[in-house]
């Protein structure tokens, strides 16, 4: 089951494997021993998108740089303004994190109506998938053997944001998830899905990729994450849960978000915070 409609294919020297379900199921993993100049991760969604969250099972240990390309209807174009928060000491996919990028404003990111048609990437011609925008990820140096990712999706806030609101939050990791739990990434991803659902109910977005700037929704997502965490900690945490809920609703009701209203993957002048929003009483 796809909780977010994200198609994920791993190309191992041109041989495609569909990991769309595994990418959104924490019980499964995806081997990602990318070989430089040969292997790619292809990601398709209905609308352009400028970020993805990687949750790792086994980190890469080799110094390597990740980059992104998108399909413009004719060729793969290099994405610009690429930011990789999975990078640690020059090693991409060394920790959980978000990658962000932007399409080149001089070359549009076009939808591929059918991967079997002319105008579609030849690398995907053995598939038959309709109406998606495709991008691919590659690395400069082959990743270490045994690199494995656990999840690929969206996360609109980070663990340090939770700690800034509740400095004691990490004391609840073991009571919440046992001795093996070391972060709140799964709860952050769930909260991010809740945020998208609530924004959709307000008519502000139609897909997670429409959220172009995290600073618009990161604090709201943090409070929604805290609600989820407190809900399993018993009645003593009911006041904190209520406070988190009130702050969450207040933040989502603010007017002024940067959403991709024209569906081109770019945060343009008319879309930057202040031009899109809704006030709910």
Task: Please report, for each region that a protein language model flagged, where it lies by residue.
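Charged, low-complexity surface segments at secondary-structure and domain boundaries
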Residues: 103-122, 167-179, 206, 210, ...
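Preference for long, well-ordered alpha-helical segments
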Residues: 255-258, 263-267
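Conserved short "hinge" loops at termini or chain/domain junctions
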Residues: 1-5, 13-15, 73-77, 150-215, ...
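Signature of Asx- and small-polar-rich beta-strand/turn repeats characteristic
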Residues: 1-156
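Generic intrinsically disordered, low-complexity segments enriched for polar/acidic and small residues
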Residues: 6-7, 16, 37-39, 151-153, ...
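Internal mixed-charge
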Residues: 185-258
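Arginine residue identity/basic-tract feature
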Residues: 7, 77, 95, 105, ...
């Amino acid at each position: 089951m796809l909780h977010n409609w994200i198609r994920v294919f791993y190309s191992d020297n041109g041989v495609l494997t569909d990991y769309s379900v595994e990418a959104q199921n924490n019980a499964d993993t995806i081997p990602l021993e990318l070989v430089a100049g040969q292997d790619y991760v292809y990601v398709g969604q209905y609308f352009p998108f400028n970020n993805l969250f990687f949750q790792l099972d086994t980190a890469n240990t080799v110094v390597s740089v990740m980059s992104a390309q998108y399909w413009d209807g004719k060729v793969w174009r290099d994405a610009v303004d690429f930011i990789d928060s999975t990078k640690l000491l020059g090693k991409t996919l060394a920790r959980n994190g978000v990658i962000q990028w932007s399409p080149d404003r001089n070359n549009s990111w076009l939808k591929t109506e059918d991967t079997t048609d002319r105008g579609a990437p030849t690398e995907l011609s053995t598939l038959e998938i309709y109406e998606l925008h495709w991008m691919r990820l590659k690395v400069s140096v082959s990743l270490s053997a045994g690199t494995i990712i656990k999840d690929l999706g969206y996360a609109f806030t980070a663990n340090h944001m939770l700690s800034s609101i509740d400095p004691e939050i990490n004391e609840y990791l073991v009571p919440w998830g046992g001795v093996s739990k070391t972060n709140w990434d799964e709860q952050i991803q769930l909260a991010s899905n809740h945020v998208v659902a609530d924004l959709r109910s307000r008519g502000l977005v139609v897909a997670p990729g429409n959220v172009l700037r995290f600073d618009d929704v990161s604090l709201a997502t943090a409070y929604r994450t805290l609600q989820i965490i407190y809900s399993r900690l018993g009645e003593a945490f009911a006041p904190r849960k209520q406070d988190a809920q009130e702050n969450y609703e207040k933040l989502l009701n603010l007017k002024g978000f940067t959403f991709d209203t024209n569906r081109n993957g770019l945060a343009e002048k008319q879309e930057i915070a202040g031009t899109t929003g809704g006030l709910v009483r």
